[in-house]
From Swiss-Prot:
Organism, as annotated: Bacillus subtilis (strain 168)
Gene Ontology CC: plasma membrane
Any one GO biological process: cellular response to sulfate starvation
Alphabetical keyword list: Cell membrane, Lipoprotein, Membrane, Palmitate, Signal
Protein name: Putative binding protein YtlA
Lineage, top ranks: Bacteria, Bacillati, Bacillota, Bacilli, Bacillales
Amino acid sequence: MNRWLRLGFACVGSIFLMFALAACKQEETLTKVKVAEVTHSIFYAPLYVAESKGFFKEEGLDVDVNTTWGGDKTMTSLLSNGSDIALVGSETSIYVEAQGAKDPVINFAQLTQTDGTFLVAREDVEHFDWDQLKGKTFLGQRKGGMPQMVGEYVLNKHKIDPHKDIDLIQNIDFANIANAFASGTGEYVQLFEPQASLFEKKGIGHIVASFGEESGEVPYTTFMAKQSYLKKNEDTAVKFTKAIYKAQQWVENHSAKDITDAIKDEFDDTDPDVIETSIERYKKQHSYSPDPLLNEKEWELLQTIMDKSGELPKHIPYNQLVNKEIAEKVTSEK
């Protein structure tokens, strides 16, 4: 009897060992990809959906996402090989190119296609008009970044000179803007979600307008990599883009509640109701790109916005910094 028991335990042990070895082998075959994200935001929901739904692993990728907090740090991480892919505003690739980069940074997959900020007023405004900003203190975003440039573009569109008609504050770090407004600085502020919805819920402020709706479609946040990386790792870039495209389609076809359930673990310090409200706002204004394609019209609007805010170092042709072939290949496959 003992002999049969020992034999049985040995067989069971062998089976477990086989499964363990198979799992290890699968892990070993996954291609590692290091991604630097400019900030950790509900605005990037499709990226987290790709992780939570296993779309990256389906493509044979082990993706490690690291938040690098700011465009400069994100680009430094990419250029110094601290990361393989960066998720950041497309304007950063233009800045790098204008400095004479020997290894250009190429945009290959778009994640968000509108600005993600909202105009929040301290006082509740029943009938908001942009003229109401004139003479008021406006807590803006960092100079040279996409939020600030889009903000100025929209203000100018409404005949408001941001440097003459309002008291513009731009010397507060991105991470401290919301706290500054909550502490009493400014009568208006430009905020991303979920902070905008959270302020409404707490009665700190009131959303009165969307910069994303006002500015039109731009390559606001894009996956990019050095040209040399894309040449050496084209297959990996294609697989990465496939996973993102799956996630984009999933987000496009699911409710804000479903998306919240998929990504809420990424934001465990945020009320799920606030996450859902934030996602609903972004879906309503089509901020989440339904596919990874970055078209030339969006690219040109980006440079128009940069030019009007005085931040465009020089005009860069679309084909010079955009690889459209990867996204086209992925979206054309059945």
